[in-house]
Structures are given as structure tokens and as C-alpha cells.
From Swiss-Prot:
Belongs to the universal ribosomal protein uL15 family. Binds to the 23S rRNA. This is Large ribosomal subunit protein uL15. Gene3D superfamilies: 3.100.10.10. One of its GO terms (molecular function) is structural constituent of ribosome. GO terms for biological process: translation. Keywords: Ribonucleoprotein, Ribosomal protein, RNA-binding, rRNA-binding. Residues 25-49 are annotated as: Disordered. The keyword Isomerase does not apply. Part of the 50S ribosomal subunit.
Amino acid sequence: MNNAIKLNSIFTELSKKKKPKLIGRGIGCGKGKTSGRGHKGQKARSGTSINGFEGGQQSIYTRLPKRGFNPIRRNICSIINVGDVQRLIEAKKIEKNSVIDKEILHKLGFIKSIKDKIKLLNKGKLNERCVFHVDFASEAAKKSVTSIGGSVEILS
């Protein structure tokens, strides 16, 4: 038991705090005058280096080809499935026979903003009657909602 290592008895040279190297304090410190930056040139100047410069090698963004296209006026639609609504009804977050619109979906966290457009899709199964106020709806979703006795009202 006497040979056990204790935290208060451990001592190594590494545990001492290493003092920082003095830079730019005359030739006696070893890193004086130019402070390890060499003479003149772009890298000797103050400020940051060039973004994407790889020492003359062709940079990564010029090596890789351009791909794709991002339209400026892209229609961003939040998708809600009929099965998701059924799960919310079963979890008693939405009442049966209620009106489902942007405000309710925003409160439940289905859409990020009330300004987002909503599209109703027919994934899953709906057993309860509901009235939907959405921007878009697939034909299959409309058919499944109306077959139960609900309705889909297109806003836009």
C-alpha cells in the first residue's frame, strides 16, 4: 500500500507552467527584429492572410466544379401529412372536429413561421373529421379528408 501513487506526490517537469516566448524584443531574445516573419512580403505584413490561398496550389474552390442552381424566388412549403394530424389528435394536442390552420400548426411547432405556405399530403391515415385551411393539398389528401366527412379549404 505504500507504493500507491497519490495525487499530491506526483511531480514532473511537464507540470511546470511554460513561460511564453518573447517576440520582437531585440536580437537577444532570438525572435527579435522581424519576429519570425522574415523580411517584407505579404506574410510579413499585419492583418490576416488571404482566404483560400494555398501557397500557389490551385485552391479548393477553383478545383471543384460549380454544381446546381438556387432560385431567388423559391416557393418554400412546409409539408404536413394526414397521419401527423391523426397522431396529434390521438395525443390530444388537437381536438376532434377542429379547424386546422397556420396558427395551430405554428403553436405546435410544425411550421417555423406563420408566413410559410403549407401543403397537405396523404401520408398516413386520418380517422377523425377535420377542417383544413392550407395553401396547397394533393388530390389524394383531399379525397381522404372528404371521405371521412372533413373538408379542405385552399387559401391562396
